[in-house]
């Protein structure tokens, strides 16, 4: 069908023989005024473009609950860190003795700079490669993933680790089957990847937002880890920290405090991650709906999206994050019980907990995946979490397989290339230490920590771009499923390309929850 048959915008495309609308009660025809009111309106102010229906403060009780959780975590951190500080000399100050102390001399400064520069350069090259040859990028990533899984399977068979070998063989065969049966969808995924990267280049604030999020998450993860150790120091009955002010010690108190610390840590981490996701989704939403409007797009979309995520929509963020945090906490307990069962020789109970852990892990993945799209609705339309969840259910009901395949293709490739960057930087760091031979590594004891540090840091650098691409892809898919006529009107050539590779773009989802 010729692409010249598009009707005049702003109506949806009307190709003969194509189903156009998935009507979800109430239907579009009876609610056009209210339906189109959901779309962001042109304005110079982000708050005016992305208006929120009353009540503006969505899901506010969960904001209160989150703030109480943060206050409790801060209180426990203050007590336990004080105990850790006062017993620091008894705990030991380093893994290594004084003769092996790792000092920041010129050599290490150059090494850190070298790691960061190489990681950034390789990450940029990967993005350039993905933009220039998206189909080859995705196909290569998927094939390499299959080869890597097959190689791991063969290694485990050679090592006579048959249980792991069979698991990897099953997953590798399943991955190969998915690739072969769904390979015709790669062109659509490639087009979406192109568009997402182009928007990322147009809005550098997406990368800045992700970078800030990585730093904040890293700092909190460090604090979280230290508080866990400090909790043992303060409340373990056999610890020297029992004599420090802040309450007595007992096994029950230790377990109770640890439960809260783990819950609070998971909860706060989830909230941080989702605030960043909503902020980036708001930037992509600005581009999708308003970049080509006559009045222009709002100024400072990143700041406006972040402000809304931290105010009107923060309760919705806390609501969805709470669900994931509870699942994570339960799964952590199950993993502890599993380890204790196997450690005590009770293999029957251990297998039961192993199966339960797998089920909880699958549920955790489903909820995270669901939340990822639900928060796109929160970012774009300012709805409460439950209303966004119902819209997400409609999206998954009608286009869930399309979204899942698209995400799997792109994310698998991105994660594989990210791991490649980590391997390359870690190898270069090893050669750097080997050939410069710094004094602190004269005995070779710092190869492992420096190489591990290089791998982690380079991976974090690459994750900055990956987080943006992942959020951008999901936001674009949500907006395209809900309002394809907007993209048809503002990006006609791109829309034609998407239609050729993905005719289901005409199957518009309309809902009013």
UniProtKB/Swiss-Prot annotation:
It is a multi-pass membrane protein. Residues 1-41 are annotated as: Disordered. Its main location: membrane. It is found in: Cell membrane. Residues 82-108, 158-163, 232-251, 331-346, 434-460 are extracellular. Coiled coil: none annotated. Pfam families: Choline_transpo (PF04515). The chain crosses the membrane at residues 61-81, 109-129, 137-157, 164-182, 211-231, 252-272, 310-330, 347-367, 413-433, 461-481. This is Protein PNS1. It comes from Debaryomyces hansenii (strain ATCC 36239 / CBS 767 / BCRC 21394 / JCM 1990 / NBRC 0083 / IGC 2968).
């Amino acid at each position: 069908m010729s692409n010249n048959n598009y009707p005049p915008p702003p109506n949806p495309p009307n190709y003969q023989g194509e189903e156009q609308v998935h009507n979800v009660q109430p239907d579009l025809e009876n609610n056009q005024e209210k339906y189109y009111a959901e779309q962001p309106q042109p304005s110079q102010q982000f708050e005016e473009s992305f208006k929120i229906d009353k009540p503006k403060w969505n899901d506010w009780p969960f904001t209160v609950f989150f703030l109480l959780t943060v206050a409790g975590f801060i209180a426990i951190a203050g007590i336990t860190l004080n105990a850790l500080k006062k017993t620091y000399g008894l705990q030991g100050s380093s893994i290594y003795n004084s003769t092996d102390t790792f000092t920041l001399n010129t050599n290490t400064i150059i090494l850190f700079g070298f790691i960061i520069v190489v990681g950034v350069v390789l990450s940029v090259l990967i993005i350039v490669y993905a933009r220039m040859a998206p189909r080859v990028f995705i196909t290569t990533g998927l094939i390499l993933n299959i080869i890597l899984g097959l190689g791991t399977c063969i290694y485990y068979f050679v090592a006579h680790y048959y249980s792991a070998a069979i698991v990897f063989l099953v997953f590798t065969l399943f991955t190969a089957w998915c690739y072969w049966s769904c390979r015709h969808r790669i062109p659509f995924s490639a087009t979406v990847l192109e568009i997402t990267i182009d928007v990322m280049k147009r809005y550098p604030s997406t990368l800045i937002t992700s970078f800030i999020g990585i730093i904040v998450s890293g700092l909190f993860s460090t604090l979280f880890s230290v508080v866990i150790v400090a909790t043992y120091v303060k409340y373990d009955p056999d610890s020297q920290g029992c004599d420090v002010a802040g309450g007595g010690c007992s096994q029950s108190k230790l377990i109770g405090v640890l439960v809260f610390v783990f819950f609070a840590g998971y909860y706060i981490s989830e909230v941080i991650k989702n605030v960043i996701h909503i902020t980036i989704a708001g930037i992509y939403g600005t581009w999708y709906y308003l970049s080509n409007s006559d009045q222009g797009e709002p100024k400072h979309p990143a700041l406006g999206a972040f402000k809304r995520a931290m105010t009107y929509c923060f309760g919705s963020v806390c609501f969805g994050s709470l669900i994931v945090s509870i699942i994570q906490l339960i799964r952590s307990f199950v993993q502890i019980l599993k380890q204790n069962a196997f450690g005590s020789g009770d293999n029957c109970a251990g297998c039961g907990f192993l199966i339960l852990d797998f089920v909880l892990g699958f549920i955790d993945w489903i909820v995270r995946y669901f939340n990822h799209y639900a928060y796109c609705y929160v970012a774009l339309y300012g709805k409460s979490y439950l209303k966004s969840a119902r819209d997400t259910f409609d999206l998954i009901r009608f286009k869930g397989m399309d979204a899942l395949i698209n995400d799997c293709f792109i994310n698998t490739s991105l994660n594989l290339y990210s791991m490649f960057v980590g391997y390359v930087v870690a190898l270069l760091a090893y050669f750097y230490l080997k050939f410069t031979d710094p004094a602190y590594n004269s005995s070779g004891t710092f190869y492992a920590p420096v190489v591990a540090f290089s791998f982690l840091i380079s991976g974090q650098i690459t994750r900055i771009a990956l987080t943006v691409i992942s959020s951008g892809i999901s936001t674009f898919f949500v907006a395209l499923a809900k309002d394809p006529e907007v993209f048809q009107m503002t990006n006609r050539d791109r829309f034609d390309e998407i239609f050729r590779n993905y005719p289901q773009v005409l199957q518009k989802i309309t809902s009013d929850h």
